[in-house]
C-alpha cells in the first residue's frame, strides 16, 4: 500500500495536469476561431489502400528518425568511450586530442556544426545528407557522453585494476570483465539522458532536408494548415520515444543492479 499510494497520487496529478492543458488549448483555439481537425491526423500516420495498410508521412518520418538515432547512438557510444579512455591515458597526445575534441564540440552550437559538416566537410569527403547527419549527431553527443563515461571511470577504485592484474587478466579482459560492468551500472542513468538528448537533437537535422519526423510534420503543416494538431502529434511521438527509453533504462538498471549484487 505504501508503494501504491504514491503511484496513484502521481497518476492523478498527471491526469489533472493533462486535463488542464487540454482545457487551456481548447479555450485558446476557440478564442482564435480555430477549428480542430483531429479526425484527419490518423491519415498522416497510416492509410489503407489496395487492400493493404501503408505508412503515411508521420510514420515514415518516425522510421527515419529511429534509423538516424540508432546509428548515431552506436557511433556516439564508441566515440564517447574512446575519448574517455584517451583522456584517462598516459599519452600526452591522447589526452590533448580528447580534451581538444570535447572543448571544441561543447563550446559550439550543434546547428553550426551541422552547417560546417554539411556545406564544408561533407562535400570534400563525399558524404551524403544522411551520413552527414549521423556524423554531426555522433560528434556532438559523443563529447558529452565522453564526460559521463570519464566520470564513471574515475569513480572505479584503482584496486579493481590491481586485483584483475594480480589474477593474470590482460588489459582487454580487465576492462571487459571487471571495469565495463561497473561502468555501465554507474553511468546508465546519465547515459540515458544523453540518449534522450540524441533523440531530441535529431530533429535539428531537418535543416538538411532529411525527411525525419520533424521535416514531415513541417511539410504536412504547410499543406494542410493544421499546425496545432500536427505539431502536438509530433511532440507526442517524441515524448513516447523518450519515455519508452527512460522506462527501458530503469528496467536495465534494476536488472544490472540485481545481477551485480548477486555476484
Q: Which residues make up each language-model segment?
A:
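Transmembrane alpha-helices and adjacent helix-loop boundaries
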Residues: 1-263
